[in-house]
Amino acid sequence: MIAIGNIIADRYKVLKYIGKGGMQNVYKVLDLKLDLELALKTPLPGLESKRFLKSAKIAAKVNHHNVAKTFDYVEENGSIFLAEEYVDGENLEEKLRHFDFLDPHYGACILHNLAKGILASHRAGVIHRDLKPSNVMVSGGVQISNLKITDFGIATLTQEFFDEAAASGDLTRSTSGTIKGALPFMSPELMFGEKGKAIEASTDIWSLGAMMFRLLTGEYPFGVYLDAAVNVKTKNRMDWPNFMTSNPQYQNLSMELQKIIDACLNYDPRSRPTAEDLVKYCETLCYLSEKRFVGRVNNLIQGGISGFIDGIPNNSFFSMESVYGSKTPNTSDRNTVCYSTFEGHPCPRAHPVILWKN
């Protein structure tokens, strides 16, 4: 552990310890030369790699607002460090704790941004290999205003780690927390492919599909840990939940997203869409990206089919037809909701509306 206040490479002052990821410790630092806050990442003991520098050089070529920028690579006292863009927010796995699942408008916005970031990286020759909600940072509170895919800078280290685990036995039976956390989103070719065979960009597309399934349903498409490996092997995927298409207000967009995700989860890597295909398809989707608010349902009227939300800046009217999911808000235990607003009289109209967990 690096002490707070220490200066790395005469440049990076450690401000706080953010936490430990699967393969690295992460610190918030201040770049003393640029007066810029960054995330400084260093591999955990035993995971240092000579290929780390090569990976960092490749990732530094990626310049896109949906990818956390790699700024610097330094070595000091036998340790190696990667300086990456700092995102003041939470990752998608943490954000999902506020929801049972995301509505399709939220989901389409996230998918579109992820696809653009992945496309930029693939064009630079960088394959992530470990895409999952915890590797996607967002800021803006309830908003998805600053989505960044992180850890492209350690892509080579990730592959080396997976290769070493596979060389010592069945990768899917590894006790490593890193691998266990990756399995629900890992492609079949990464789980069960031939040793030494090159991993292609299509593996990221599978992971993106699995991640979007998780965000839109609240469930993992193939389960977790060893169950995920068994179910991927036997092609035993969870069905889409009925609530996604049972409400006419959300049916069309949900069906479009399901079609995209089904294509991403094709077992034949050559049949999956490319990142460019996904960006083009997302550009045809009709989804709302208006600002989101959090408020409390304070009154239901018309026999419970509509009501009002106490929120900022104004109270809003909503219809139960605008509520997404199998559960509906009430004025007791399930009364906090996330929503967008549109002009209405005498008060704004809320849509879409989704339950929010504090």
Regions of interest found by a model, annotated:
Residues 72-73:
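A short, aromatic-enriched beta-strand patch in the conserved N-lobe beta-sheet
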Residues 110-111:
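Activation segment signature within eukaryotic-like protein kinase domains
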Residues 77-91, 95:
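Conserved short submotifs of the Hanks-type protein kinase catalytic core
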Residues 116-126:
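Protein kinase catalytic-loop region centered on the HRD/HxD motif
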Residues 15-21, 26:
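Protein kinase glycine-rich loop
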Residues 44-61:
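AlphaC helix of the eukaryotic protein kinase fold
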Residues 126-139:
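Catalytic-loop of the protein kinase fold
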